[in-house]
């Protein structure tokens, strides 16, 4: 059978694409977060055989379903013209003020849309799925970019961090502070007691970064906003303040307690949950640290703001600091952001693949349905040509329905795309990171442009 041979040939071509293109796409997405070796591509006989059988089975079932009604009829009935279905009123006709103002062409279009229910839902669901995929693709990219810009441009306000050695002497600490206070390139420096600790609840445990600093100082380097209301948070001595992702992992809310196991150990109470996207940070005041954990907090790190964040300025200051005894490490916030933003370039490849696949699917859906639309209504189209319709008007008669159905599909796809985007964001988040969960308006606009091109 030549058709079967052609179909199996197409299946083989698609398998080659599936074994090469999609593994690379998924692998590229994982390289955003992880350092991974080069990918090795392999073909699997069992998967290939299953895909061939599934493709043949789906094609056969669809063909039988389409031909079943025809095969049940007699040859004589098949040779006679099919009797038109009895006319039915559409719901728009019951809205008389609207129906009276519609032109004849628009009334015909409305009747045809609701007359062919299968074609209506096939087109709407098909276009809706394509739109949802494109929105999800653009939405994922905007979420990742939003995460970095929000975290490092709006929430974090410090240029660098200097960490002292564990055995730093008081005079070494004083020397570092004197240098920071006397250097004109340093706008301000905020001392804090920084350490790593394990946070534990009955259902989960993970590692977080604990920073103890005065409530009137933290606002100079970090903005804390309530994760629900967006209102600014003012730290107090009633508990610790944790990020939203950590609260979800620990399944705790304001007023709950969890165990903190670090330089000191003890139960702490959640006083607030703030908006945050990268890493886990637990903030508390020195007063609460002493009351809850029964220990004093000595500054062992400094959060710095420079007059300029350029590389030369930072390196010059870091060089002098690292030459001082008692200084262990220095880190520049811009380097962290640049590294992440560079990895975000890989997302563009994934987005392009999603957009091309969705646009191709939309074109196939519309092409096939347009052909079916014309084939099933040859007599109707011939009749309106006899009534005096020009070729352009006959084409518009058909395309007008496709455009309306596409608009319905886009509307459905906007709702589907929003929830698909949220699902993908939550599914791809790792424990140490939370992505932006709102769908950017640009994702809807760009998806509308791309889905309209095949139409």
What are these regions (language model features)?
Residues 14-49, 410-448:
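Short helix-loop junctions at transmembrane helix boundaries
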Residues 104-237, 244, 256:
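Juxtamembrane segments of multi-pass membrane proteins
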Residues 140, 144-153, 314-363, 373-376, ...:
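Peri-transmembrane interface segments
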Residues 155-156, 234, 273-315, 334:
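Small-residue transmembrane helix packing/gating motifs
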Residues 1-12, 449-455:
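Single conserved hydrophobic/aromatic residue that forms the stacking wall/gate
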Residues 6-22, 383-424:
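Transmembrane alpha-helical interface segments in multi-pass membrane proteins
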Residues 17, 22, 47-85, 445-455:
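C-terminal membrane-exit region of the final transmembrane helix in multipass inner-membrane proteins
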Residues 231-288:
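Hydrophobic secondary-structure segments that place a key small or acidic residue at a functional site
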